[in-house]
Amino acid sequence: MALKITLKPKERMILGGTVVVNGSSTSSDLIIEYKVPILRQKDILSEKDANSHSKRIYFAIQLMYIDEENRNTHQNIYLKLAKELVQAAPSTMGLIDKISESILSDKYYPALKLAKKLIAYEEEALSCAQ
């Protein structure tokens, strides 16, 4: 089944490891007829913006999703980061377990959604600590 995506003007997305940009001043519809990793601009985290532990976890999962060739390397980075985070904040164990289950099932997009919850949790915890 094909997937229809509407890109807003100048919006970016990653499609199978390639950055696609809508260069038009109007929205554009894309029909994707092949199963490839897709990340919309709102879901893409740059390496420089991965400036917290949970964001680095998100970034590692993002790379697992779009860079199949180096997936093992990204998984090892994720495991190290997840272990460090759980040691520093044991309350994150539940989310980390769910993220890890998704990764083990090769469900990287759902893992990214869970990692967004982890980022929100970390940000809330840090704001309460201040």
List the model feature ranges, each with a label.
Residues 1-130:
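Terminal leader/tail segments of proteins
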